């Protein structure tokens, strides 16, 4: 990574956040270094005015680059791919890119949100769900998501060492 990357990129993240993990993985695969700024969700640091000024959505991760803040891990990963194209995290063909994006979306939209901290807190506090009900609910939807992911992998002749080919893609990042 260039020295300027270290000074100009600041990643607001939480060490146990899946969306923060995917962004750290993408940054690592791209060979980019960034300043890490911890946002402790356990102490509700993301709800404080200081972080709200960074990201009005009050979610991690957020990536500050040259004073501008990018939010939402899918958008940030796309930005990384566009601004730092090598190594590529998307294949070259349009059909292959769509397949990789579909795998990533399956995790990002159908699996990960089910086990998201704020969703689980809503189930507990607003709906009064007990842990057994929450665990059953999570297991049902997460299993369905991973079953679909595995079926897509099994049907893909390009599957190799990674989800799609011989090098990591956005699908593996998620």
Give the positions of each predicted feature.
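Surface-exposed helix-capping loop/turn segments at secondary-structure junctions
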Residues: 86, 151-164
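Amphipathic alpha-helical packing segments from all-alpha helical-bundle domains
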Residues: 135-155
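GST-like domain detector, emphasizing the conserved glutathione-binding G-site
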Residues: 4-136, 154
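Charged catalytic carboxylate motif
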Residues: 22, 99, 141-144, 174
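GST superfamily/GST-like fold recognition
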Residues: 114-118, 162-174
